[in-house]
Amino acid sequence: MTSGGKVRIYELSRDLGLDNRDVLNAAEKLSIAAKSHSSSISDGEAAKIKALLNSNGKAAGGAKAPAKPDAGNQILSLKKAPSTPSQSAGAPASAPPSRKPEIVAKPAAPASPAKPAPSAPPSRKPEIVAKPAAPASPAKPAPSAPPSRKPEVVAKPAAPASPAKPAPKPVAKPVAKPASAPAPARPAQPLRPQASNRPPQQPSNRPPARPAAKPPVVMSKPTAPPPRPARPGAPAPRRDQNRPAVPMRPPNQQQRPSPQRSGPPRSGAPIRPGAPQRPGMPGRGGAPQQRRGPGGPGGRPPSSLELVGKPIRREPNAPQGRQGGAPSRPGGPGGMRKPVSPGELMQLQKPGSRPTPGDGPRRPPARPGSEAPRRPGEAPNRPNAPTAPPRRPGYRPAAAPGMAGRPRRPDWDDSARLDALRSRSPQKQRQKVHIIGENDDSLAAQTGGFAGGQEALVLQASLARPSKPKNLPGNKGARPVALRRRKKETTRQRQRRRAMELRQAREAKQIRPEMLVVPEGNLTVQELADKLSVESSEIIKSLFFKGIIATVTQTLDLESIEKVSQEFGVPVLQDDIEEAAKKTVEMIEESDLDHLIRRPPVVTVMGHVDHGKTSLLDAIRKTRVAAGEAGGITQHIGAYQVDVDHAGASKKVTFLDTPGHEAFTAMRARGTKVTDVAILVVAADDGVRPQTLEAISHARAAEVPIVVAINKVDKEGAQIDRVKQELSDQSLLAEDWGGDTVMVPVSALKGEGLDKLLEMILLVTEVEDLKANPERMAKGTVVEAHLDKAKGPVATLLVQNGTLRPGDVVAAGPVLGKVRAMVNDSGRRVKEAAPSSAVEVLGFSEVPAAGDEFEVYPDEKAARSVVGDRASEARATRLAQQMASRRVSLTSMSGQASEGELKELNLILKADVQGSVEAILGMLEQLPQGEVQVRVLLSAPGEVTETDVDLAAASGAVIVGFNTTLASGARRAAELAGVDVRDYNVIYKLLEDIQAAMEGLLEPELVESPLGEAEVRAVFSIGKSAVAGCYVTSGSIQRNCKIRVHRGKQLVFSGDLDSLKRMKNDVKEVNTGFECGFGCDRFADWQEGDRVEAFAMVTQRRTLAT
C-alpha cells in the first residue's frame, strides 16, 4: 500500500493470488489507467477490480458443478455460455478445495454432459483421438474415483466390450456416441500422470474473454493388442490432490509472443512448446508428446491421442497456460501416471484411419492444412497429420502456482508464423507433428472448452509432462548446440593444425642452407628469411643495425642480401651466375645427325682455392704451370689437351683449368657451361669449402656428371672419410658407400691415383656418348679473351662442333673477326681445330667477351649483319651497366650532399684478359660503398694507352692495371698529367689498395687517447678559485689536455686542464709518482679523494663501414 490510499498493481495481484497481467486486463476493462505492474491505483479502483475478478471467479465456479456421468454416453464435454462467469478458485462447487488446480475455459453454452450435438458452432479446434489397446473396447467408469473429477477421458479397458460409437454424422458432430458400455469414460484402473517438473501455482480467478467456439473431439480407437486388465478401485498414487482449480483468463490482444522467442518470466506462465516435437521424443511440460510405455514402439503405449486440425490464431499477449501431462493408458506399468478425476472430461473420437471391427461409422479424415468451413458441432479430423493443440482467441489458461519466474514458450499464432517455423530449420519442421498418448488431457489446457454446452477443465499441474532432458535427441536446443560445438571444434582443429605447421616449420628452419641462391639479384625480406631459415624479425633487426629500414614485403638488393647472409654465415650465389653455367645453345643441329662421330671429352677441373687443381693438371700433363703463377694461384682459365693411353689406344682429353678464388665465379661458370665432365678437386685435409659448394651447384646447373678427386691424401692430417661424409651431405655419395658418385683418392705431388682418375674419366665419358659433326663449319664458345700488345685481340676458342680453319669468318657476339692464325696450348700453330679442341685465335677486330658463342659464317656480309644487331644490344647493356656502377640513389645523394661533397673514387681498369676484368668488377661491387662510391669509367682487357691517361686526367681517375703493361708513351704522359697508374699481378693486393684509397677519401675522426690518472690529496684556495694538489697514479698528465673529474661513481667535471704546476713552476708534463697542482678556469669545486682522468683527442683514419 502506497501513501495516500494508493495500491500498486503487483500488491493487488499478490493479494488476489493472480498474475499481474490479469489485474492489468481487469483494469483495462474498467478503463482504469494502469500501464505496468508498478502503477498505482486508488483504493476504490482496486475494489472495483476485486469485485470484477471475484464475480468472474464465481461464474467459473458455477461452471464447475458436478456433472453426473451419463451411463449411455462414453464421450462427455463441458461448456458454458459466454455470459456465465468462472467459478472462484476458492469455492469449487463439488471438487475438493485443494485437490487439483483446474483451468476453467469459457464455453459457449451452460455446462451439460457431452452429447452428439449437430448444432455445435464451427470451430478450428482439433480433435483428440484416443487409440485404445483392445479393439472395440469402450471405456468404463472407475467406481472408486474421487467424485470431484467431473469430466473423464474415456479409454478402452483390457476386457473386450462394445466399441465406442461415434456421432451419426461423420464430420458434423464433435461427440462420438458409444454403442454400449454406459460407464464413465475412465478405465477401471486409474493411470499415473506424468509428473511435472515445475511447482504448482496459485489458482487464477481471471474470467475468460470469449466462449469457446467448439471443443476438440476425442475418439477411442483400438490400434494394438489389448493391454493388461485394469484394476477397478485402485488409483495410482497422486502427488497433487489438494490443489485448487485454476480458472481460465482472457489473453491480451496487444502482445503476441514470437514462436522463436520465449516471453519474459511471468507468474502462472508455463512453458509452451514453440514447435511440436517429433513423434517418440519426450516433450516439455505440457507438450503433447508420444509417451514411452509398454505395448508400443519405443516404449509408448499401444494407443495414443491424435490431435487433428489446424492451430487456432492466438492473441498476442495470451498467457500460456500450463499443459498438463496426459495420464498413461490402462495396462501401463504402475506408478507411471496419476488417475484422472471424473471432473476432467474430454471428448473422444475415433480417427478416420485404421478402422477396426466393432467401431461405429468413422469421420472422413480432413486434408492437412485444410481450413474449409464446417457445420455446427463439426470438428476437424486429421488422424494422420496431428498438429499442435489449438488455442482459441479470448482464452488464456492460468498456470499452476509456483510458475512465477519461468520462461514462457511462444505459441503459434497464425499460418505465417507456422510457415516461418517450417522454413527455419529441419528440426522445427519436424516438431510440428504431435503424437499424443492415450488419455492425454494436456489438450484441455490449450483448448479451454468444448462444444456441447459444457466446460472442459484443464488438468492439474501435477499431470503436466516434465521438461525434456537436455541430453535427449528430441531437445529443441540440441541441434544448435551441436552445430556450435562443431564450429568450435573446427576452429580448434584449425588452430591445432596451424600450431603444428608452425612447429614443423620451426623445426625445419633449424638447418640453414650451405649456400644462398639469389634469383634475379633480389629477394624480399620474407623470402630471405625463409631461405636462411630464420624469422623475418631477425632479418629486419639485422638491416636496422646496418642503417636500413625495411619491412617484411620490401625487396632487398643483392648488396643488402649479401650483408645479411654473411652475418648468418651463408654465402650468396647469384642466380644469374648459376644460369651462366646452364647450356643454353644446342651445338648439334638436325642436319648433323647423319654425320656424327665420337669426339674427345671436355673435362673441367673445379674446386676451392689452393686445393691443388693446377698441380693435378701439371701432374697429368707433366708440366710446371703452377710454379710460374703469380701468387701461387690461378687467375685465368686455361685449356689443355692431353693424350691418355686407355685400353691399348691413345685418346685425347681436353682439360679446362678454372680459378678457385671467389672472384672468378664467372670463369668457373663458363668452364662448366662447355664441359662434359666436371672433376671436383677436394683437399683431404681441408674438406668441403664455399667454392666447392659453388662448383657443385654449377655442375648440377649444367647437368654434367661429377668425378671427385680427393687430393693431398699423402699430406699429414688427411681425412678421406671426413671428405666423403661432407660430400654425402651435398647428395654426393661415394660408390663404396652405396652411391653412384666416383671418388678417387689422388696425390698431385707424388702422382698417386692419376691413372685411376683418368680411367674413371674415360669410363664416364663413354657412357655419355659424346659425338659431333666435323664436316660442318665450326661452332663453339669463347673461353677467354685478352688484348696482346703485339698480337692484338686474342681469344681462346673451344670448338664444340665442326672444324675451324684459318680464313674462316667468325662472329663472336658483337665482335667480327677473320681467323689469321691458330695456336694450341703448346704454342704451336695448327691448320685446323677439330671438335673438343681449344685454340688461341688471332684476327678479331676487338676483344670478344668471354663466354660468348662463336659461329663461322660462309661470307663476311652474312656475318656482319648478325654482328650489327648484336652490337646494338651490347651497347645498350654496357650503358646500363655503367649507370648501375655508380650505385648512387637520390636518397643517398641528398643525404651525403647535406653533409658535404659526394665522395667518389673514379677508376679506369685494364687487365690482361676479359675474365680478369669480370672478376675485378665483381669484387669491387662487394666493397662497402655507403660513404664512398666506386665509379669505373672504363674497364677493358689490354695495355694502358695514352688515351686512358687522358681520360684519367680529365676525370681525376686512377688507372689500375692487372697483369698488363703500359703502351709506349703512356708512362711519360701519365707523369706529365700527374695521373696515378697502379699495376698488379695478384688480385688480393689490388683489392686491398682500392679499399685503402676509398678510406683515404673519408674524413678522419677524432678519438680519445688515454694519458694517465691522478688523485686529489689536498685543495688550496687562491682567491675565488682553488687549486688541487694531486698525485699522478698512472701514465702522465700533460698541460692543456682533457680531464674528467670523478667523485665516487659520479662525473662532476669534464673540460680542459688550464694550469699544471710542480713546485710553483709551470710544467708541460708530470709523470707517474710525482705530485703536481691542477688548475681549471671553469672548475673550483675540488675535494680530497677525487679521481682525475686525463686524455687527449687525436685524429684517426676512418675505415669503410660494413
From Swiss-Prot:
Stored InterPro entries: EF-G-like_DII, IF2_II, IF2_N, P-loop_NTPase, Small_GTP-bd, T_Tr_GTP-bd_dom, TF_IF2_bacterial-like, TIF_IF2
Molecular function terms from GO: GTP binding; GTPase activity; translation initiation factor activity
Stretches with biased composition (Low complexity): 57-72, 81-97, 172-199, 251-292, 319-329, 395-405
Bias kind Basic and acidic residues: ranges: 408-422
UniProt region (G1), positions on chain: 607-614
Listed Basic residues bias regions: 482-497
Annotated region described as G3, given as residue ranges: 657-660
Keyword Ion transport recorded: no
Function statement: One of the essential components for the initiation of protein synthesis. Protects formylmethionyl-tRNA from spontaneous hydrolysis and promotes its binding to the 30S ribosomal subunits. Also involved in the hydrolysis of GTP during the formation of the 70S ribosomal complex.
Annotated protein name in UniProt: Translation initiation factor IF-2
Gene: infB
